[in-house]
Design a protein with these regions (language model features):
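N-terminal alpha/beta PP-like core and its mobile active-site loop of ThDP/TPP-dependent enzymes
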Residues: 1-210
Length: 210
């Protein structure tokens, strides 16, 4: 519904159940990559052309491999949905020792690493899935920045009733008339005007307006 019909990524033991659902989906195609960094670049390129991209990694080793690409998407205003398949909520709450963790009983270390390079983050539970997932996706679309979704494997296996299908929300137009007037005055007063635009023209799809 947001505009991404392909999902990039690398299989891992904490995301396999979710990947089964992606592969079984009629309208979404799974694109496997050689590593997560490549997947993040592929999702970035897809987003630049189609408006938004999505990728899936596994907890720890997988999501950390994607950090460089997601940081690049943030720097260049490219909306990518980075989904991390994670251990069950029970494992995380009990602080169990599992592979790909730091072995200290904490499971939010990697999620915190995504906070400076994503515009929104969500820890998905059965209770908040229908509100948090639309929230972060709409934030990605509106702010043209990547977002991070932490998806415990037990939540991925839970059937959740969706009463209202997802619909992208359009951010209200801010008052930019004063800026338009300023640019117009400068163009009219210039003898040989040249317009040099930034990458935001691509990010916000403003080619026609320009």
């Amino acid at each position: 519904s947001a505009g991404a019909d392909k999902v990039f990524g690398v299989p891992g033991d904490f995301n396999l159940a979710f990947l089964d659902d992606i592969i079984a989906h009629n309208d979404i195609k799974w694109i496997g990559n050689t590593n997560e960094l490549n997947a993040s670049y592929a999702a970035d390129g897809y987003a630049r052309i189609n408006g938004i991209g999505a990728m899936v990694t596994t907890f720890g080793v997988g999501e950390l491999s994607a950090v460089n690409g997601i940081a690049g998407s943030y720097a260049e205003s490219v909306p990518v949905i980075a989904i991390t398949g994670a251990p069950t909520r029970a494992v995380e709450q009990e602080g169990k020792y599992v592979h790909h963790s730091l072995g200290e009983g904490t499971f939010d270390d990697y999620r915190k690493m995504f906070e400076p390079i994503t515009t929104a983050q969500a820890y998905i539970t059965p209770d908040n899935a229908t509100t948090e997932i639309p929230r972060v996706i709409n934030t990605a679309l509106q702010q043209r920045r990547p977002v991070h979704i932490h998806l415990p494997i037990d939540v991925a296996l839970t059937e959740i009733e969706i009463s209202n299908p997802f619909k992208p929300e359009v951010e209200p137009q801010k008052n930019v008339q004063s800026y338009i007037n300023m640019v117009q005055d400068k163009l009219e007063s210039a003898s040989q005007p040249v317009i040099i635009t930034g990458h935001e023209i691509n990010s916000f799809h403003l080619h026609k307006e320009l």
